[in-house]
Amino acid sequence: MIVRNVKDVIGTQDEVRTDTWVSRRVLLKKDGMGFSFHETTIFPGGRTHIHYKNHLEAVWCIEGDGSIETIADGKKYELGPGVVYALNEHDEHWLCGGKEPLRVICVFNPPLTGQEVHDADGVYALPAEAQAA
């Protein structure tokens, strides 16, 4: 059994910070669960281009506000407590912080290894062993 407190991730290599978000990666590939589980905060006013070509992601909004806008069709969805969205089609999108920090719980498949950040195309790269398969 794995039991962790998200507070124990703060200040470790499993807390990844950019200009627009901070992600506390509580379960990772090394944990062998087949998915990764993160608590992420989107900063107010931030705007992040994301296109997970290699991963599927489900997101549960816990507190705060923001929006997500799909690039293909320009549809915009407001985000707040209780909203769940799933990027089941590798949807390219803009994730935008609102007036308050947006705290979300994220699940990724395949699982992240821990240090991923979005590249210039908004993508998380696959680990080397997955690319070779």
Curated annotation (Swiss-Prot):
One Gene Ontology term of the molecular function aspect: ectoine synthase activity
Keywords tagged on the record: Lyase
Record-linked CDD domains: cupin_EctC
Gene Ontology biological process terms in this record: ectoine biosynthetic process
InterPro entries, sorted: Ectoine_synth, RmlC-like_jellyroll, RmlC_Cupin_sf
Pfam families for the chain: Ectoine_synth
Catalyzed reactions per annotation: (2S)-4-acetamido-2-aminobutanoate = L-ectoine + H2O
E.C. number(s) listed in UniProt: 4.2.1.108
UniProt cross-references to NCBIfam families, sorted A to Z: PRK13290.1
Homology family: Belongs to the ectoine synthase family.
Function description: Catalyzes the circularization of gamma-N-acetyl-alpha,gamma-diaminobutyric acid (ADABA) to ectoine (1,4,5,6-tetrahydro-2-methyl-4-pyrimidine carboxylic acid), which is an excellent osmoprotectant.
PANTHER family (alphabetical): L-ECTOINE SYNTHASE (PTHR39289:SF1), PTHR39289
UniProt-recorded name of the protein: L-ectoine synthase
Organism: Bordetella petrii (strain ATCC BAA-461 / DSM 12804 / CCUG 43448)
Phylogenetic classification of the source organism: Bacteria, Pseudomonadati, Pseudomonadota, Betaproteobacteria, Burkholderiales
